[in-house]
């Protein structure tokens, strides 16, 4: 909390919380989605609302948008203000490489069905690599196989192949 308050006092407007599901560690667990995570993020939101109400909490959760929903909290107990839309980033690059927007459209339709107060930050690149964690369950009936498809994407973006 000290660093959080220090940074907000320096004038930052957005605090990025990296790898939200893993911010609480406990031996003997996967350290993912432990109940303490929600308590910590809720506490940060409460502090922000009292001490620095103009500051937004931007979370990073590498999951599909519909699985990120619990990290927004509830109307009564809000947590993060917004989240990176990691899935759409990878799906956008997939659409560029393949010329196929079906998966991107499906994901945008899902996001558009979520409550309007759930805000996602769409972006095209970050400091991490692009993980090809695409929705292969949806893509399978379209004749797309995961391993060859990932190989194609890597080859495409390294200049080894084209559509």
Q: Model regions: which residues?
A:
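Active-site and adjacent substrate-binding regions of carbohydrate-active enzymes
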Residues: 1-163
């Amino acid at each position: 909390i000290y660093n959080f308050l220090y940074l907000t006092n320096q004038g930052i407007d957005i605090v990025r919380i990296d790898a939200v599901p893993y911010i609480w560690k406990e031996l003997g667990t996967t350290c993912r989605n432990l109940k303490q995570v929600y308590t910590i993020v809720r506490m940060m939101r409460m502090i922000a609302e009292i001490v620095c109400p103009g500051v937004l909490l931007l979370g990073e959760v590498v999951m599909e948008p519909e699985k990120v929903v619990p990290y927004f909290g509830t109307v009564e107990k809000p947590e993060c203000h917004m989240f990176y839309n990691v899935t759409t980033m990878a799906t956008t690059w997939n659409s560029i490489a393949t010329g196929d927007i079906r998966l991107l459209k499906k994901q945008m339709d899902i996001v558009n069905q979520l409550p309007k107060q759930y805000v996602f930050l769409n972006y095209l690149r970050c400091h991490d690599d692009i993980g090809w964690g695409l929705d292969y369950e949806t893509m399978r009936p379209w004749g797309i196989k995961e391993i060859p498809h990932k190989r194609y994407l890597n080859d495409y973006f390294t200049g080894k192949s084209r559509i």
